[in-house]
Amino acid sequence: MLFANLWKAIILGIIEGITEWLPISSTGHLILVDEFIKLDLSKDFMEMFNVVIQLGAIMAVVILYFHKLNPFSPKKNGEEKKDTWILWSKVLVACLPAAVIGLKFDDYLDAHFYNFLTVSIMLIVYGIAFIIIEKRNKNVAPKCTNLKDFTYKAALIVGAFQVLALIPGTSRSGATILGAILIGASRFVATEFSFFLGIPVMFGASFLKIFKFLAKGNTFGSEEIIILITGSIVAFVVSIIAIKFLLNYLKKNDFTVFGWYRVILGAILIGYWLFS
C-alpha cells in the first residue's frame, strides 16, 4: 500500500511543481487528479496534503532567489539591503487581503468550492481573462518594468486579486499576475512579484492546514510523513525547472497559450462532468 501511495504522491508532486508557477492553478489540478488517482488515505489528510505539498514548491523560489530576497547578505551594500527590506514590506502588504479573508472563510471555501465543477468553471473564466487581457495589451508598453518601481498601492491591489485565488481553479499565480498586468506591470515584474508573494502566503496556508488537521484529532503516521515529504521533494525539484522555463518563455512570449490551455481543459472537464 505504501508503494502505491508513494508513486501517486510523486505524480502529485510533479503536477504541483509544474502548475504552481504556471498560471493554470495547482490546487485545481490536484483536485482534478484526485478524481482519477486517489491515495488510500483519509479525506482530512488529502485536503491538508494538497496545500502543504506547496512548501516544496515555494522552497524552489527561496533557493533560486535567495540572494535577491536576503536582506542580510554580506554581498549587498546598504542601499541594496534597504531595497530588499522595501521589497519584503510590499510583499507583506500584498498578503493582507488574502490573510484576512482566508482565515475567516477557509472552512467555508473548503466545504463549498473544493470540487470538480468549480475548478472546471474557474479554469475557463480566467483562461478567457488571460486571452482578452493579452490581446488588449499586445501593443501597449508596460508602465512598470522594474520591481523597485512597484508601489505599495500596486502591491495592495495585487493582494486583492490574490483573494480571488481562494477559489480552486483560479490560480494564485494567475490571479496575481493578471492583477499586476492590469495596473501596468510588465509580464516579468508581475511574474516575479507573484513568486515572492507566494512565500509568506503558502507558508501561512500550509501551517494553517497542518494546525487544522491536528486540531481535528488527526495524527501523522510514518506512512503519511513519508508521503508528504516525498511529494514535497518532487514538487521542489520540478518547481526549479518550471520557474526557469517560465522566466525564459516570457522573454519572447505572453500568457495567451496558458489562457487557451485553461479554456480547453475546463471545457473538456465540464463535458466529462456532464456525461460521466
UniProtKB/Swiss-Prot annotation:
EC number assigned by the record = 3.6.1.27
User: For this protein, what reaction is catalysed?
Assistant: di-trans,octa-cis-undecaprenyl diphosphate + H2O = di-trans,octa-cis-undecaprenyl phosphate + phosphate + H(+)
Q: According to the lineage, what is the superkingdom?
A: Bacteria
Task: Name the membrane topology term.
Answer: Multi-pass membrane protein
Where in the cell is the protein located? Cell membrane
Does the record carry ATP-binding as a key word? no
**Which stretches are transmembrane?**
45-65, 85-105, 113-133, 150-170, 188-208, 225-245, 255-275
Task: Report which residue ranges the record marks as coiled coil.
Answer: none
User: Into which EC class is this enzyme placed?
Assistant: hydrolase
Q: Which InterPro entries match?
A: UppP
> What would be an example GO MF term here?
undecaprenyl-diphosphatase activity
One short Pfam family name for this protein?
A: BacA
| Broad class of where this protein is predominantly found | membrane
| GO terms for cellular component | plasma membrane
Biological processes annotated in GO: cell wall organization; peptidoglycan biosynthetic process; regulation of cell shape; response to antibiotic
Keywords tagged on the record: Antibiotic resistance, Cell membrane, Cell shape, Cell wall biogenesis/degradation, Hydrolase, Membrane, Peptidoglycan synthesis, Transmembrane, Transmembrane helix
The entry's other comment says:
Bacitracin is thought to be involved in the inhibition of peptidoglycan synthesis by sequestering undecaprenyl diphosphate, thereby reducing the pool of lipid carrier available.
Tell me the function of this protein: Catalyzes the dephosphorylation of undecaprenyl diphosphate (UPP). Confers resistance to bacitracin.
Which protein family is named in the record? Belongs to the UppP family.
> Known PANTHER family for this protein?
UNDECAPRENYL-DIPHOSPHATASE (PTHR30622:SF3)
- Protein name, UniProt field: Undecaprenyl-diphosphatase
Q: Which organism is it from?
A: Enterococcus faecalis (strain ATCC 700802 / V583)
